[in-house]
Amino acid sequence: MSKISKGHSTMLAGGLRFATVHELLDFLPAEERALTEELRELVISEAPELKERLSFNVPFYKLHRDVCFLWPASVIWGGRRTYDGVRFALTSGHLVPGCEPYLQRGGRKQVLWRDLTAITPSDERMIRQLLQAAMAVDRERSQGLR
């Protein structure tokens, strides 16, 4: 983990920049770490073809474009914490049929999310279904069908 040098503006948690997902996990409080790991394992097991990368200091998962991300509440964006747990989000949720009302839109046009403090069997089922649908949309978009 490295500190951002002075003079650079950052919206990352406390000016920290994580080099790996494992550094991020080490930074998180125990409950958030466990939930993030559980969601991460769910995404990887359901969609092993997705590539994991860090962006904005949180894990994003990409096929052709970004499909989803996990945003632990302890990784601050905009200067203050606005939810608890971990946010699971589809980056193009507006194109994925059946997302709402499980995922929320808030005031966003494109990204839809759900804030989780635990994963129930119904959450797991919905996340698996939504990941498959989001990957289908991503494949269609990569072929110019959407």
Regions found by a protein language model. Give the residues of each.
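Charge-dense, helix-prone N-terminal extensions
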Residues: 1-146
